[in-house]
A protein has these predicted regions:
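Non-heme di-metal
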Residues: 2-214
Length: 214
């Protein structure tokens, strides 16, 4: 990535404030969706589906932190508008996941997700708008595939139909985020940025595996 000096960020957007928030504070800041459709209790779901949903919750939690990391660092008005809009959507997703997945069913790695998510947003923001857009495209490309793998295992009819629809709706938002980022990103990227995006993709895959197990 070609380094450019970031423009001054608003005094209120201090990185420490975002990193120091507890998991509960992050969850409480998300809008209360109240929109999760009726579905079987989490404990009654198949084990594989519980694990997938645990990774989904962790992913939405991490997504909130990615955009907070961007907003904490970037002073670019277009980047901030982009991140703020996406953040609101990710907060809604997180609120939905909080309704579906009880605290006992969530990964114990959320403190790590908080830090790593924030850094995934903050680091590219140091290098400018193109690094941010490329990063989001990489993240959302992975998320699209991750949701699709779950959706194809669930049928629209039956007891898991409402839950499947939640995943379909979340996936549609993530695809929209990916496409928007791709439309704003330049197709030609230097070696460092390509490597960074590869790390982001592989890191996302590793995070899913960890969230399912811990």
């Amino acid at each position: 990535m070609t380094s450019t000096a970031p423009t001054a960020r608003p005094p209120s957007a201090q990185p420490q404030a975002f990193v120091a928030q507890t998991d509960e504070q992050i969850a409480s800041s998300a809008p209360q969706a109240g929109l999760a459709p009726a579905a079987p209790a989490f404990g009654g779901l198949p084990r594989w589906l519980q694990q997938e949903l645990r990774s989904d919750h962790a992913g939405e939690f991490g997504a909130v932190m990615i955009y907070r990391g961007i907003l904490a660092i970037s002073g670019d008005a277009s980047v901030r508008e982009f991140a703020d809009s996406h953040l609101r959507t990710e907060q809604k997703h997180l609120a939905l996941m909080e309704e579906i997945i009880p605290p006992a069913g969530r990964t114990r790695l959320l403190p790590l997700w908080r830090l790593m998510g924030w850094l995934t947003g903050a680091l590219p923001a140091l290098f400018g708008r193109q690094a941010v857009f490329a990063t989001i495209e990489a993240v959302e490309t992975f998320v699209d595939h991750h949701y699709q793998q779950q959706i194809v295992r669930l049928t629209p009819e039956g007891e898991h139909g409402p839950l499947r629809q939640v995943l379909v709706d979340c996936q549609a938002d993530e695809v929209s985020h990916r496409d928007e980022a791709a439309s704003l990103a330049l197709p030609k990227r230097n070696v460092i940025l390509r490597l960074w995006c590869a790390v982001v993709g592989s890191g996302s895959a590793a995070a899913v595996v960890a969230a399912k197990r811990v």
